[in-house]
A protein has these predicted regions:
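An N-terminal hydrophobic leader/cap segment in hydrolases
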Residues: 12-65
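Membrane-embedded segments
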Residues: 62-149
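Short alpha-helix in the alpha/beta-hydrolase fold that links the catalytic acid
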Residues: 105-106, 224, 233, 247-257
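Gly/Ala-rich beta-loop-alpha elbow adjacent to hydrolase catalytic centers
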Residues: 166-174
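Short beta-strand/loop motif that positions the catalytic acidic residue
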Residues: 231-232, 236-243
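Acidic catalytic loop of the alpha/beta-hydrolase fold
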Residues: 242-246, 273-275
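C-terminal catalytic histidine-bearing segment of alpha/beta-hydrolase fold enzymes
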Residues: 253, 261-295
């Protein structure tokens, strides 16, 4: 009877494999981006703070080659696109949910680091999210990130003025790029990880409370805890201590501990997965980011 139960559970888990992969890439499609006019759920409620004028908001897109076909990935650049060859630019890689409208509030926050317009900020939707074409997969996410970096380099950005910021799922492309600099058009001078996950395997084991390889449940190969060992640029790690989605102790702490060289941490009591900037206080949050970028 015991062996029959094990076989039944195994077959049930295999049937969920596609669903679990989809859960980690939980994007939603749109007919159009609304940004400030979006009425759906958002990552943070800014309540009118940190406004960005229309003159600094630029819808952009860039080509990504996926399986031999060229698709278009959509992005939003906040800043003066004519000054990318002079400005320091933050490439923001968002989390696993919905699309850029959900994370637009965060891009506005980052556009106010050091004062409005001090830094350019580029955010983009991964393939399969929002209006970005293609299918949501790990490799396609990396390909889109590479194209975003090339878009910035083509406009004059250099390594010393390039900062990457990854939130949640977005920690994967940041660690990938920073750990494999020769494969990308630019190498970030600093990286920021907020609520990163250690690996797909640990994420699944945490969720399922099962001691089995994560590869049994998902196709993802993401392993930030290993990739971070290859990163030799300064790291700022931010994590809410009440994060129940990606536990600080089993995810962020492991990534941080595996990073050698210059690193800083900000651990926020009471901060949950999405709420850490709010709990910390928006102004204190962006001032801490500014201090790291300017150091």
């Amino acid at each position: 009877m015991k062996y029959i139960l094990v076989i039944f559970i195994g077959l049930s888990l295999l049937s969920c494999r596609k669903r679990l992969d989809s859960f980690l890439f939980n994007g939603s499609k749109l007919e159009s981006y609304q940004l400030d006019n979006y009425t759906g759920e958002v990552s943070l409620e800014l309540n009118g703070q940190f406004a960005v004028p229309d003159s600094l908001i630029h819808r952009v897109h860039f080509p990504v080659v996926i399986d031999g076909e060229t698709v278009q990935v959509q992005g939003v650049y906040v800043g003066d696109t004519n000054h990318i060859n002079q400005d320091t630019v933050i490439l923001y890689c968002h989390g696993n949910k919905d699309h850029m409208d959900f994370y637009w509030c965060r891009e506005k926050l980052y556009a106010n680091i050091g004062g409005l317009g001090r830094y350019g900020v580029l955010m983009f939707d991964y393939p399969g999210f929002g209006l970005s074409e293609g299918t949501a997969t790990e490799n396609n996410m990396y390909a889109a990130t590479s194209s975003a970096i090339s878009w910035l380099k083509d406009r004059g950005l250099s390594n010393d003025r390039f900062v990457m910021f990854g939130f949640s799922l977005g920690s994967a492309p940041v660690c990938e790029v920073a750990g494999h600099s020769s494969d990308y058009a630019l190498q970030p001078s600093k990286i920021i990880l907020e609520a990163p996950f250690a690996s797909a395997e640990i994420m699944i084991q945490d969720a399922a409370l099962l001691s089995m390889p994560g590869s049994f449940l998902v196709d993802l190969k993401i392993d930030n805890a290993t990739e971070i060992k290859k990163v030799n640029v300064p790291l700022l790690w931010i994590h809410g201590m009440a994060d129940s989605f990606l536990s600080m102790s089993s995810h962020g702490q492991l990534v941080y501990d595996n990073k050698t060289g210059v690193k800083e941490s900000v651990l926020v009591p009471g901060g949950e997965h999405e709420t850490t900037p709010f709990v910390m206080g928006y102004q204190a949050y962006i001032e801490r980011l500014a201090a790291f970028i300017q150091s």
